[in-house]
A protein has these predicted regions:
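Active-site-proximal inter-transmembrane loops
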Residues: 134-156
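Membrane-anchoring alpha-helices and their flanking helix-loop junctions
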Residues: 1-134, 163-217
Length: 217
């Protein structure tokens, strides 16, 4: 009887951790961000807040292009799917926010967006070349905001989502925001499950207890 041959996980891992393969994946992954950034800065109605918010996307693109090649990458296809939906869901989310209505003075969400951008820029600069969308071991980062929470980029993202709800409220905006928060929280847990096989990250988890908000969660 013939047997079905399955792919060798170690060979596939070796393939994914090849520098040129990782670089190619990174370039493909940031393509939607590049397109979004182009439309953002060519928009005749570009505001100061949206212009500043684009800075963190620029940092994302640069660090992804020059990111460190991982020593391990998850081979779980569900984790890759989650990373895809959570990452690009945020980009898609902004397309729906203009359909809502503000429920507070515009200065409030504008201030929150600037706060979220500051958090994410600080976190992205601190993370540096260890960035990635799917769970991968690119070196453990403990500097900057990572001294206080384990997922500061997501923390900034949560603040931004809350700001957009206040600025462009609608049932759809609220529903999408809640779904995205849930996906990012799940992504955080999955990333930690993968990384804690590294003793250095396991020790980091005991030192920094909170995932998103110091002293809270």
């Amino acid at each position: 009887m013939a047997t079905v041959q399955t792919a060798n996980p170690s060979r596939f891992m070796e393939f994914l951790t090849t520098p040129w393969v990782d670089k190619t994946i990174a370039i493909v992954a940031i393509t939607p961000n590049v397109v979004e950034l182009y439309h953002r800065y060519t928009d005749a109605n570009l505001t100061f807040v949206r212009g500043v918010a684009g800075i963190q996307t620029i940092i994302l693109i640069i660090t992804m292009v020059f990111r460190r090649t991982p020593v391990r990458v998850t081979l779980n296809p569900w984790y890759w799917l989650l990373a895809f939906v959570a990452t690009y869901g945020i980009v898609a989310f902004y397309a729906f926010t203009a359909r809502g209505r503000p429920i507070v003075p515009i200065i409030v969400p504008s201030a929150l967006v600037l706060i979220s951008v500051a958090i994410m820029i600080y976190a992205r600069v601190s993370l540096g070349r260890s960035i990635g969308f799917v769970p991968a071991d690119r070196g453990i980062v403990t500097r900057g905001p990572y001294k206080f929470v384990r997922h500061p980029i997501y923390s900034g993202g949560f603040v931004a989502l809350f700001a957009f709800i206040l600025r462009s409220y609608s049932p759809l905006t609220l529903l999408l925001a809640v779904i995205l928060v849930g996906l990012l929280m799940l992504k955080s847990v999955i990333e930690e499950h993968f990384l804690r096989d590294n003793p250095e990250y396991a020790a980091y988890m005991t030192q920094v207890r909170y995932r998103w908000v110091p002293g809270v969660a």
